Amino acid sequence: MYARPLARLIEQLQRLPGVGPKTAQRLALHILKRPESEVEALAQALVEAKKQIGLCSVCFHLSSEPVCEICRNPNRENNTICVVADSRDVIALEKTREFKGKYHVLGGVISPMDGIGPEQLTITPLLRRVSQQQPKEVILAISPSVEGETTTLYVGQLLKPFTKVTRIAFGLPVGGDLEYADEITLARALEGRRELD
């Protein structure tokens, strides 16, 4: 049906999250219509991003430096840490411009069905960070899916002996993801956070 190179391109594009066969085909055909210089720039940007972006050694957010811009920023509050599942959540919360503290990215949520337990997440570095920095508050901002709730409860219980632990209030449906919420909903959720019982 497709020439082999086009079929390979479509196959590779389908590996991206949220990209099905039709979208992959549409993207592939669009790429082929673009000037070669644009396609080369796209390919180079992909390779450079993969090579140059790593994880912050403090919070595990994506960064091109050993310590990310947020952790290096002296204007950010050191006494509040917001714990999220992944970097997309940091980006979503940053868009609200409401949170002035620092973050900790777990790298996912506890999901036994997917073979992800606490040891696959950055929970141990979080506990070490909280015991050393002694923040006044840790905010748990994890999406309210079944796995997210499990992770929130697990991490919350581990942190309670060290500091005040709150979670954001949700105007999101159960099973919804933070990255898809609008800025107003996220801002209200941050303002309405409450302490874990």
Swiss-Prot record:
Which branch of life, at top level? Bacteria
Zn finger residue spans: C4-type:
56-71
User: Keywords in UniProt for this one?
Assistant: DNA damage, DNA recombination, DNA repair, Metal-binding, Zinc, Zinc-finger
Q: Name one GO molecular function term.
A: DNA binding
Mind telling me which Pfam families this protein's record contains?
A: RecR_C, RecR_HhH, RecR_ZnF, Toprim_4
Q: Does the keyword DNA repair apply?
A: yes
Has keyword Electron transport? no
Question: What are the recorded Gene Ontology BP terms?
Answer: DNA recombination; DNA repair
The segment(s) forming the Toprim domain are: 79-173
State the similarity comment. Belongs to the RecR family.
Q: Which PANTHER family match?
A: RECOMBINATION PROTEIN RECR
Q: What function does this protein fulfil? A: May play a role in DNA repair. It seems to be involved in an RecBC-independent recombinational process of DNA repair. It may act with RecF and RecO.
Record's protein name: Recombination protein RecR
* Organism per entry: Nostoc sp. (strain PCC 7120 / SAG 25.82 / UTEX 2576)
